[in-house]
């Protein structure tokens, strides 16, 4: 079966990574979570006590920052300056830093180059905010996965609670709304639906139902690509 690239975009907490991982497992594809790369930059900024709005210092620190994505047993690991930060970048305080640094053109340009290199061999499922519109505009299948802000906050709340974090639902809801605003209004590569993307609203759907919809679309595209 011919391999294609799949772009999955959408706002924070829409379930992009969950669906991408399941899809990659079923298809034998490689999953690349681009948000993890921005989180790694956000973590570095946070660790160095730099304001997420200090563009000059962030660009300076970026030049001495080494971010690597490694795939181990089908799982994506993120390394920041040689340290495995796969779990650390999921800390709640890193989220807003990631959103702020992602607005900086120089940060996006550097990470987009990395992302495009990773997708050259095909057979890649890449999720993020600007994959179908900017990173992989020629991806054979583009999905825009969304849900209400309230539903996304609820999912994130349950996920973080399960990991042992002490979080407040209303604070998470506020952060998600702010991230949506940041993502949609940033000057460079904002969050938007690609013209040829298929929109899936997962608000009232289970993970299995969303996965089934995406698989049906995948097989339809692959059939036409032969």
From Swiss-Prot:
It is found in: Cytoplasm. GO terms for biological process: nucleobase-containing small molecule interconversion; pyrimidine nucleotide metabolic process. Keywords: ATP-binding, Cytoplasm, Kinase, Nucleotide-binding, Transferase. Its EC number is 2.7.4.25. ATP binds at residues 10-18. Belongs to the cytidylate kinase family. Type 1 subfamily. This is Cytidylate kinase. It comes from Caldicellulosiruptor bescii (strain ATCC BAA-1888 / DSM 6725 / KCTC 15123 / Z-1320).
């Amino acid at each position: 079966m011919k391999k294609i690239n799949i772009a999955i975009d959408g706002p924070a907490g829409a379930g992009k990574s969950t669906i991408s991982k399941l899809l990659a497992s079923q298809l034998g594809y490689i999953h690349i979570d681009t948000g993890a790369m921005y989180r790694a930059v956000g973590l570095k900024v946070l660790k160095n006590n730099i304001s997420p709005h200090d563009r000059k210092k962030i660009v300076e620190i970026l030049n001495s920052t080494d971010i690597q994505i490694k795939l181990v047993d089908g799982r994506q690991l993120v390394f920041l300056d040689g340290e495995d930060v796969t779990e650390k970048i999921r800390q709640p305080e890193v989220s807003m830093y990631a959103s702020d640094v992602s607005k900086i053109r120089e940060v996006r340009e550097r990470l987009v180059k990395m992302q495009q290199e990773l997708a050259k061999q095909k057979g890649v499922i890449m999720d993020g905010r600007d994959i179908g519109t900017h990173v992989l505009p020629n991806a054979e299948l583009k999905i825009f996965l969304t849900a209400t802000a309230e539903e996304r906050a609820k999912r994130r709340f349950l996920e973080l609670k399960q990991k042992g974090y002490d979080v407040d639902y209303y604070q998470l809801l506020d952060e998600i709304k702010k991230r949506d605003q940041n993502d949609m209004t940033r000057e460079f590569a904002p969050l938007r639906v690609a013209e040829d993307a298929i929109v899936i609203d997962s608000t009232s759907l289970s993970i299995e139902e969303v996965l089934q919809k995406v698989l049906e679309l995948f097989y339809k595209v692959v059939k036409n690509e032969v």
